[in-house]
Amino acid sequence: IETEVFVQGALCTCFSGQCYLSSFAGGNSGNRGRCKQPCRKKYFYDDAAGGEFSYALSLSDLSVGERAKDLAAAGVYSFKIEGRMRRPEYVAAAVRYCRKIFAGGNAERELSDLKRTYNRGNYTKGLAFGQDKRLLSPLVQGHIGEKVGVLKVVNGKYYVESAFRPAKGDGFKILRQ
């Protein structure tokens, strides 16, 4: 049996091919390639402690590239990388990352490039390699890049503590922890 495994990209709140949320929320069927990603929107939920808005249905992106050799040893025939609704630069970075792993090299640089191309803040290994607490990404939606440092305040002045050397064209985003 030829087995395919999804190794990189966005996870769907529903089982892929079984999503009806987009259809019910606006008549755009995810099963027909027209998903409007209602799972990526902020929702309000109310509990005993009070209510709050969050991206409660937003799953983290999957990344199991470093386990690709284990999957191949288990008989996986094909490794799938998400490309639908992604920029070509993201797909290219994901392919470079996986290729480097299969070549047996250190893929830290490629993973860093991938995170800078598109990253919701954390990756999950899903459930295939044990329960992953990073399965949901309820606090941040959209691309935030790669963490490169910490902003510090000393005597009323702001400093960035980082080993990252910025290059022309780099952008930075400051997030609260």
Residue ranges and their predicted role:
Residues 1-177:
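Surface-exposed amphipathic alpha-helical tracts and adjacent flexible/coil segments at the periphery
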